[in-house]
Amino acid sequence: MMKTLAFIRRPLSHMPGLAAACILTVLLSGCQSIDTEGLVASNAPPEISGPAASAIAGDMVSRLAEQIGPGKATVALKVDTSPFGQALEAALKGWGYAVVTDQKTDSGMTIVTLAYVIISFDGQVLARLSTNSVELGRAYTVTSTGATATSALSLMRRG
């Protein structure tokens, strides 16, 4: 471990301390991800309008379908009472997924556990969908009549 740190520290010694610390933090944080067993908590702020929630949910579910296949599995989803939670459930059903919200399913079914998080940040909304095998994220600009993607899709696959 010490040899590895010395190897990293040597090239960074020519940079100012703050830049070196930032680079090292980014490198080390790339090794972390959320626990895949804890994908049942979902959260979205209630102040996102229905049309904006529908636009975000529709876009994110279409991207999820590209990764796991359209309508090929039952999705286990713990929905909150926000407009986004309801819009996400409707979008999943629109893409042909069976949705269970009580976390109880038949033992022979293929289940995809799905969690979502919506965070307001700096005038935008950050949306994230997480499953045991893939995590999708994207930023949106929200208006009262809808939402527009303002970033590329972030995709992380798990082994």
Curated annotation (Swiss-Prot):
Keywords: Cell membrane, Conjugation, Lipoprotein, Membrane, Palmitate, Plasmid, Signal. It is a lipid-anchor. It is found in: Cell membrane. GO terms for cellular component: plasma membrane. Its main location: membrane. It comes from the Bacteria. Residues 1-21 form the signal peptide. A lipid is attached at C22 (S-diacylglycerol cysteine). A lipid is attached at C22 (N-palmitoyl cysteine). This is Conjugal transfer protein TrbH. It comes from Rhizobium radiobacter (Agrobacterium tumefaciens).
